[in-house]
Amino acid sequence: RDRSPSRGLGDVYKRQIKGIALKLKGKGNHIITSEIEHPAVKETLHFLETLDFKVTYLPVYENGIVKVEDVKDAITPETILITIMHGNNEIGTLQPIAEIGKLARERKILFHTDAVQTFGKVKVDVEELNVDLLSLSSHKVHGPKGVGALYIKKGVRITPLIHGGGQERGIRSGTENVPGIVGFGKACEIANNNLEENYARLVKTRDEIIEKVLDAVPKSYLNGDRNERLPNVINFRFSSIEGESLILLLDAKGYQASTCLLYTSPSPRDGLLS
């Protein structure tokens, strides 16, 4: 297995997705993804579209999950890459990555998954998930910010985006951030050691919150599948109250809440709309 440190989340996505696309352009120009991917993934794909790559954006359904059958139907002779996130950062749904990965292997198509949200929260095993490439970010497991990692299956080659001294086996040249890498490694160790205990605790709390909110609040709805979801992410919508009023009420009770992600506008995000 090859592992490579990175400079952060956006850098990881660009290196893997752009690197694979440019490497395989002679074999095909079609990429399959979903409508609920992280903006850094979607913007990378939009850039590739300016280079004459074709991208299919698969929908999700009411449960927030991509159908494997839709992936299968989207494959063409020109398909070189499938990239579907493992867990969604907005609504928390988990995608059928192992099944999609199996399909990709059968069709000899490279498969990338964004495991940034799931790593440290649920078991992430590249062999069980059938992935060729996988993205991670340090800050999601309480490690140093601005540090990421990518898994590249042995034998898979990508085109480097930064040239120079040939560090990281030529995948990314430039002086390596040793303190960041060490800190990320320690954060991974701690997260892995406490994984089962934290998972059980979070699932119990998550399910209690879901049950109590749906029972107590009129016209409240859970977004995404009830069971196939991250242990630490819940997304509700309320038809009986205006969002900002709810935020003020929760703040008065000592709860931190928001109607949007930190780096977005108050408008609904693609994942929720999908």
Predicted feature descriptions by range:
Residues 51-52, 106-107, 253:
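Helix C-cap/helix->beta junction micro-motif
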Residues 129-186:
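Active-site PLP attachment segment
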Residues 252, 259-265:
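A C-terminal functional module that forms or caps the active site or interfaces directly
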